[in-house]
Design a protein with these regions (language model features):
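Acidic/histidine-rich helix-loop elements
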Residues: 57-58, 86-107, 134, 223
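Serine-esterase "nucleophile elbow" of acetyl-processing enzymes
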Residues: 27-89, 96, 112-120
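Ser/Thr-centric signal marking residues that sit
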Residues: 5, 52-53, 165
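N-terminal secretory signal peptides and thylakoid transit peptides that target proteins
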Residues: 1-16
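Alpha-helical cap/lid subdomain in secreted, periplasmic
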Residues: 71, 77, 103-259, 263-266, ...
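Boundary at the C-terminal end of the N-terminal hydrophobic targeting segment
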Residues: 23-25
Length: 275
């Protein structure tokens, strides 16, 4: 058989690429192929984090993202999930963080037993990065410490773990000199680094910086914490990630939707135009 010309080789290569692309598109469009991260309803959610997790300066406890997320999940479950907020202001990931001495203690890696494993959650949110970035923790050290926290937890329990990026904030001079070592670019690098840890450690990642749209009016007047609106955006994005990865959040809806009463009535709207 004579060798193929350059034109024939190019045509064959393009044809193979087209077939491969079509096959990939078909596989992506086929239902039922996506991984299900949690097939049952959640029983207990624990949020481990810093001041925004604790509530920041939301106008009341029910407007904190932890409470809002818990309400959203419970709205779609037949059985109520317990919600436990273990946020501490100025908290950091580890005793090895350079800003540890200025932080709210104990650090995350010091408080895993009483604040996580003893509680036996099946949904765990570990929200760190904002204070470590502001306090000068090198990203590589932060990633190593976050990985250590996740692996320590999984020696005892195996919850679904969700880890978000830092929250959006506007005043990188606030909080005093120990907390002035970050900017928005560093926050985005942290977000990428946290995503890398999530992929390596079998966790779900939530990009809160992207969710914020960099809208300054979602931030509290102190320039650091989320406003009530910001807390709602955080909860919404976390719920979106959970709902699109966990079939357990659809179980109750799937059970009741076929027998639900048909409540829609557009007859007046049609009658307005003679139909």
């Amino acid at each position: 058989m004579p060798p193929l010309s350059r034109r024939e080789l190019l045509a064959a290569s393009l044809a193979a690429t087209t077939v491969s692309s079509l096959a990939l598109a078909r596989s992506r469009s086929q239902p039922g192929k996506k991984r299900d991260w949690h097939a049952g309803e959640f029983r207990r959610m624990v949020a481990l984090g810093e001041s925004t997790t604790a509530g920041g300066w939301s106008t009341n406890a029910s407007r904190c993202w932890v409470s809002v997320l818990g309400q959203m999940i419970n709205d779609f479950q037949s059985t109520r999930m317990d919600v436990i907020n273990n946020g501490i202001g100025s908290n950091v990931i580890s005793t090895r963080s350079p800003c540890y001495k200025h932080s709210g203690k104990p650090a995350a890696n010091e408080r895993l037993q009483k604040h996580v494993t003893d509680l036996k959650p099946d949904l765990l949110i570990i929200s760190y990065g904002l204070n470590d970035a502001r306090g000068g923790t090198p990203l590589e050290l932060f990633q190593a410490e976050m990985t250590g926290v996740i692996r320590t937890i999984r020696k005892s329990i195996n919850p679904l773990i969700l880890i978000p990026s830092p929250y959006f904030m506007t005043d990188f001079r606030a909080g005093g000199q120990p907390w002035t070592k970050a900017n928005l670019e560093i926050f985005h690098e942290y977000g990428k680094g946290i995503d890398t840890v999530a992929r390596a450690e079998n966790c779900l990642f939530v990009d809160l910086l992207e969710a914020s749209g960099h809208a300054s009016w979602t931030v509290h007047f102190d320039g650091i914490h989320q406003s009530d609106l910001g807390h709602r955006i955080v909860a919404n994005r976390m719920f979106e990630v959970l709902a699109t990865h966990c079939t357990g959040l659809a179980r109750h809806t799937k059970l009741i939707e076929k027998g639900a009463p048909r409540w829609r009535n557009e007859s007046k709207l049609k009658a307005d135009y003679g139909y």
